Amino acid sequence: MRLNELSPPPGSRRARKRVGRGEGSGYGKTSGRGQKGAKARSGTKAYTTYEGGQMPLQRRLPRLKGEARGRHTPAHPKVYDPVNVGELAAVEGDTIGLDELRAAGLIRKKADTLVKILGDGEIDRPVTVRAHAFSRAAREKIEAAGGRAEVL
């Protein structure tokens, strides 16, 4: 066997499609491009998000918050887990922090949870409450009972 006798196995190599070489080839006249339109022209390519004139998806969806709407709308506003003063009465101990609230099932177990104490309900014992935010009414009720409201 010599190099000039080598050839690929039959059927492993495919001949190049020669378009525009007569009707009998099946790729004559319009060369497999159909009739008119942008796809029939040379050198044109529709961008990937083109939907044929239909309103594109990125224009159908509402605009995002943040920079897209203007600088005054935060893209990711702080989300607090609310806990009412009345719910604090069920928590044992003189100091109530995030761990105690989690153990009582009043806030989510996620570590980055922000907690705000709200003023609904009453508390009748002095406690030190540690949270990320307090409403004015909650702070007044905690301090009226002889406790302290500490912001984390």
From Swiss-Prot:
Keyword rRNA processing carried by entry: no
Task: Answer yes or no on keyword Membrane.
Answer: no
Q: Which Pfam families does its entry note?
A: Ribosomal_L27A (PF00828)
Molecular function as annotated in GO: rRNA binding; structural constituent of ribosome
List every stretch annotated Disordered: 1-79
GO BP annotation list: translation
Checking InterPro entries in the record gives:
Ribosomal_uL15 (IPR030878), Ribosomal_uL15/eL18 (IPR021131), Ribosomal_uL15/eL18_sf (IPR036227), Ribosomal_uL15_bac-type (IPR005749), Ribosomal_uL15_CS (IPR001196)
* Superkingdom: Bacteria
Q: Which SUPFAM superfamilies match?
A: Ribosomal proteins L15p and L18e
Q: Where is the composition biased (Gly residues)?
A: 22-35
Keyword list (alphabetical) reads: Ribonucleoprotein, Ribosomal protein, RNA-binding, rRNA-binding
Q: Which GO terms describe its cellular component?
A: cytosolic large ribosomal subunit
Quaternary structure (record):
Part of the 50S ribosomal subunit.
Its function, per the record, reads:
Binds to the 23S rRNA.
Q: Which family does it belong to?
A: Belongs to the universal ribosomal protein uL15 family.
Entry-linked PANTHER family: 50S RIBOSOMAL PROTEIN L15 (PTHR12934), LARGE RIBOSOMAL SUBUNIT PROTEIN UL15M (PTHR12934:SF11)
HAMAP family to which the protein is assigned, alphabetical:
Ribosomal_uL15 (MF_01341)
Q: What protein does this entry describe?
A: Large ribosomal subunit protein uL15
Q: What is the species listed in this Swiss-Prot or TrEMBL entry? A: Rubrobacter xylanophilus (strain DSM 9941 / JCM 11954 / NBRC 16129 / PRD-1)
Identify the gene encoding this protein: rplO
